[in-house]
Amino acid sequence: GDNGLLARVGVDLLSIKPRYKGEASMLQNGDIVKYTALVDDRITTVSPFVYMQYKGDKFQFRVKSILAQAGEHMNLNGGYGVTAKSNGLDEDGHWEYTPVRYSSSWVSMMYGKKWQGILFAGYAKNLGTADGLLPDTTYNGVNYADISNNYLSKNTYANINSMWRLAPGVVRNWGKLALSLEWHITSVQYGELLKLKVVESDGKKTTHSYVQAENGMAENNLHWITNHRLQMMLKYSF
């Protein structure tokens, strides 16, 4: 059957072109001429992972750990940022990028047949960008990058530092019918984004959010927020 030990090691490779056109400029008859150019932007990321599972008659065990770069396509906190812009005179207009690195590990256990005890535990840590971001402003001697000029954490929040979840539960099985009750405890450590009001070209004031340019993180005023959730599910398997 499917009982026994299974182990896997793998790598997720992602290579994308964030833009295909951009602004460039050249000197023509003594004038600086700006134009839209086709650019060769590209970011390539490598995310290694390990996975192991064990299945016995009554006991099941699974564990996975991944070190992700720009892992939003794997439903992880991710994204990438801009490290350099070649928008100067006689430059081709391309940008350089760096990924957000994210470590995520979890373990899942189940024991029993008619009555089953289950436990899930997971931890994730934002490790920041691999290289420093292109700074947009300096505040109190620290370089900051505007989130709107980058592609950070589009599916979640750029100010998440780390998080953990613990979810114990119990399942009662009646053949194809199962009733489960789970208690999810989730805690997230947030940092405080730098928020500054900017006067735009049309004279309007808008609030911009910034992360530290050194690592793409928000590490000021770190604080934990914990959420408790009870979840009950009735399932019938055809």
Predicted feature locations:
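Structural signature of outer-membrane beta-barrel channels/translocons
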Residues: 1, 53-57, 108-114, 171-175, ...
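Detector for outer-membrane/organellar transmembrane beta-barrel domains
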Residues: 2-160, 164
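Extended, charged low-complexity segments
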Residues: 104-109, 210-211, 215-227
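Conserved C-terminal beta-signal and adjacent last beta-strands/turns
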Residues: 105-107, 119, 163-177, 232-235
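Substrate-binding/catalytic groove segments of enzymes
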Residues: 116-118, 128-130, 174-180, 191
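C-terminal beta-signal and adjacent terminal beta-strands/loops
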Residues: 176-215
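Outer-membrane beta-barrel "beta-signal"
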Residues: 222-238
